[in-house]
């Protein structure tokens, strides 16, 4: 969501599962209003009944659809430029993601972004669990103090992760969560990378 424009694919994927269960499909705007972590809670908001079937069934359907269509995703506008700008200022960059590690490495490689990152850290499951734990490991592995690290994210969860890790955070509203919801975190929220990079550098 921050670097990769995949919100549309997440909406397509969840709608496949909703329609199969005779539940109402959602728009991208609705998605950005309800998407949350843990993702099980987001599914329940949309009407999935986990007394009837385990969460993992719908979750696996979504992951399968996402995986089959993942190659269609593109980078957010300005992603490459912002990575270049940060790198040219001798600031190191790493990825911390709630995406499965193999998906994460695939898309970073597919978009030829490897050279920009010191570390690329995803999770070991397909249900978006464990970002905080992986974040703790990442921060401990980085040769920097907490006050020298900043998270750039697109979800309320990114703000929560930053709070747990005791590091700074700014948010961008072109991803999985609406600007209105992001502003409620109290973080600085930007609508494009140009304004964000001016704030950081």
Write out the residue ranges for each language-model feature.
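N-terminal helical cap/lid subdomain that shapes the substrate entry/recognition surface
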Residues: 3-80
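Conserved Lys-Pro-Asp/Glu-containing loop-to-beta segment of HAD-superfamily phosphomonoesterases
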Residues: 131-160
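A short, structured active-site edge motif that brings together acidic residues
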Residues: 30, 114-129
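Conserved phosphate-coupling serine/threonine residues in phosphotransfer and NTP-handling enzymes
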Residues: 2, 97-99
């Amino acid at each position: 969501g921050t670097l990769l424009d995949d919100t549309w694919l997440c909406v397509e994927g969840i709608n496949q599962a909703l329609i199969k269960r005779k539940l109402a499909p959602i728009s991208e705007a609705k998605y950005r209003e309800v998407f949350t972590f843990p993702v099980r809670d987001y599914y329940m908001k949309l009407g999935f009944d986990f007394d009837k079937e385990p969460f993992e069934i719908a979750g696996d359907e979504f992951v399968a659809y996402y995986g089959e269509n993942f190659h269609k995703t593109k980078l957010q506008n300005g992603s490459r430029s912002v990575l270049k700008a940060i790198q040219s200022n001798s600031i190191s960059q790493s990825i911390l993601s709630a995406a499965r590690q193999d998906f994460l490495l695939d898309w970073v490689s597919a978009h030829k972004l490897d050279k920009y990152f010191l570390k690329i850290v995803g999770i070991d499951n397909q249900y978006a669990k464990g970002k905080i734990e992986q974040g703790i490991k990442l921060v401990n592995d980085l040769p920097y103090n907490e006050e020298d690290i900043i998270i750039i994210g697109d979800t309320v969860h990114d703000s929560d992760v930053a709070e747990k890790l005791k590091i700074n955070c700014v948010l961008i509203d072109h991803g999985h969560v609406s600007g209105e919801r992001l502003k409620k975190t109290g973080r600085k929220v930007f609508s494009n990378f140009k304004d964000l990079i001016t704030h950081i550098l």
